[in-house]
Structure formats: C-alpha cells, structure tokens
Amino acid sequence: DDISVPERLERQSEFMEDNPQIGVCGTWIQLIGKYNGIAELETEDDLIKIKLLTNQNLAHPSVMIRKQILENYKLSYSISYTVAQDYDLWVKMFDHCSFANLPEPLLKYRVHEKQNSRKVVEQNSAEGNKVLTNLLIKMGLQLNDSDLIIHNKIFSGIGINSVTIDKTLSYLIRLRSSNIRKK
C-alpha cells in the first residue's frame, strides 16, 4: 500500500535519460503510518555504494532500474532470498552501473507493525549478512570468522570493547585497503 506521487515516474525517467550512466534510480520517501517523516537517502553514487556496507540506501518501492543493465549482465532477483532480494540485486549491480536517489520524496511508504516482528528482523539479518559477505568478498576482502561480527558491531552502533579493539582496527584497515584497490 505504498503510494507514488503522480510525477514520480516522469521525474525518474527524465533523470535517467539525462544520466545514462545511472542504472538504478530511487527517490527519497515520505514515511506514513506507524512513523512519519522524510527519509532523506544519499543521492550520490559513491555514498550510496558505501552505505551498502552498513544498510541499504535505496527505497526499493521507489527504484527504477535500467533494463539494459539487467539484460547485459544477466542479473535478476535471487530466489535464495525472501527478504533481501533487493539488497542482493544492488550488490550484483554494484560494478556495472552508477546509483542515484532523487532528493525529493516521490513515494509515500507505509510503515506497519509486521515489518518489525522478531521473525522478520531475524530473517532480514541472516539474509542481509549473506549478501554483505558477498559484497565484502566482491571488494576483495579476505574474511575470517570474526570479521562479520566485528563489521556488524561497528556499523550497527553496538560498539566495540577493549578486547576487540585490535581486531577491529585490523579489520577496518583491511576494509579500507580493499576499497582503495577496488576503485
């Protein structure tokens, strides 16, 4: 029950026509229902892609995808995922095109109770971790058993303690090096 504003498709189509390097174009969203407000998502390619390391920065219901990118690279949603299909697709598209979000709320996104049920959150976390692992490997990072735990602690705001500070620093240095090599 999301609601597109009448001019959404026109604005996104025009933007993609003017920017042929953009393969994925989303928009800011207006939250309605349980929460209200504007989700001001990153608008620039580099920042959107960096945010893929921490969470998604594309509102899937607002996204327009360039069909040619999907066809050229034989990309599609994976049936392996039930709640992280979009995140997985963004990771697959990561190397093949640029991403953008239009800086205006062109979709009204309803937030409801069932989205935050324990089962959905756990499933989202498990599937999200699998996709995140694929992204980190794609970036050239050699993962060890504690890396994903450290990554999630850092980027979820849980934080780290003095016992894990050396491992955390080592992980962040390796992550930065992988990112520099990948560029």
Regions found by a protein language model. Name each.
Residues 1, 14, 18-21, 69-70, ...:
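Short, intrinsically disordered, charge-balanced linker/junction segments flanking boundaries
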Residues 27, 41-147, 155:
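Conserved nucleotide-sugar donor-binding catalytic segment
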Residues 1, 133-139, 154-183:
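Membrane-interface aromatic/basic loop that binds lipid-linked glycans or pyrophosphate carriers
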Residues 10, 126-130, 173:
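Generic alpha-helical structural signal
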Residues 7-39:
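Conserved donor NDP-sugar-binding/catalytic core segment of glycosyltransferases
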